[in-house]
């Protein structure tokens, strides 16, 4: 099975994908939706960086059908994750003002031992297809201005930079009780430019 075929059959249930691309020959991958109320999420939280605050956020959004957590499992352990969210949170409501209804790809993370093997591209593609399936015609994400590898990945995947509130960057506050300020760029991509993968 090719990566594209695996992405096409994704249907919000556990999907086993066994493709044989050069960089992934040794891995049998599982891409799955992980509910924040499930025991697999407990494992995902331990294996990937998920704070208690973010978990609470995801639980709330999931109950409202406004978030889908996708994870990649290799050899029985989680090595990557991403969230498709229908909101931008309180700290970045300026985005919702300029781009109402824009869903976001959020919290993309790949274990450092599994990077540069196509897993990030696969997770972004699956998240885009899920957004398409949900009826969205555009998707966005925030990328830290100093994160050159992520910016290159998103540019390669067809994302383009947008201004928010008349500025090239926006502030994102992360962490409690003493939040740290990150400078981000908004990137968006039309989901109508590619054939529907459903």
Q: Residue ranges of each PLM-predicted region?
A:
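C-terminal "cap" of GNAT-fold acetyltransferases
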Residues: 2, 9-18, 137, 144-151, ...
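Acetyl-CoA-dependent GNAT
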Residues: 18-112, 124-126, 130, 191-194
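Generic detector of contiguous secondary-structure segments
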Residues: 59-73, 136-151
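Structured loop/turn residues at beta-strand edges in well-structured enzyme cores
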Residues: 65, 77, 117, 134, ...
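Residue-level detector of high-confidence beta-strand sites
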Residues: 81, 162-164
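Conserved residues at the C-terminal ends of beta-strands
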Residues: 85, 142, 165
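Conserved glycine-rich acetyl-CoA-binding loop
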Residues: 107, 111-125, 134, 145-152, ...
């Amino acid at each position: 099975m090719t990566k594209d075929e695996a992405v096409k059959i994704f249907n919000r249930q556990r999907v086993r994908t066994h493709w044989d691309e050069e960089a992934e020959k040794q891995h049998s991958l599982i891409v799955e939706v992980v509910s924040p109320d499930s025991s697999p999420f407990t494992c995902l939280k331990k294996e990937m960086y998920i704070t208690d605050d973010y978990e609470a956020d995801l639980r709330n959004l999931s109950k409202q059908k406004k978030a889908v957590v996708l994870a990649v499992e290799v050899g029985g352990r989680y090595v990557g994750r991403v969230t498709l969210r229908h909101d931008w949170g309180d700290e970045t409501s300026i985005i919702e003002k300029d781009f109402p209804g824009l869903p976001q790809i959020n919290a993309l993370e790949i274990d450092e031992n599994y990077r540069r093997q196509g897993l990030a591209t696969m997770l972004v593609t699956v998240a885009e297809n899920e957004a398409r399936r949900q009826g969205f015609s555009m998707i966005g994400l925030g990328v830290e201005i100093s994160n050159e590898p992520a910016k290159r990945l998103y540019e390669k995947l067809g994302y383009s930079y947008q201004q928010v509130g008349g500025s090239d960057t926006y502030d994102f506050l992360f962490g409690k009780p003493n939040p740290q300020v990150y400078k981000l760029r908004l990137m968006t991509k039309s989901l109508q430019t590619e054939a529907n993968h459903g």
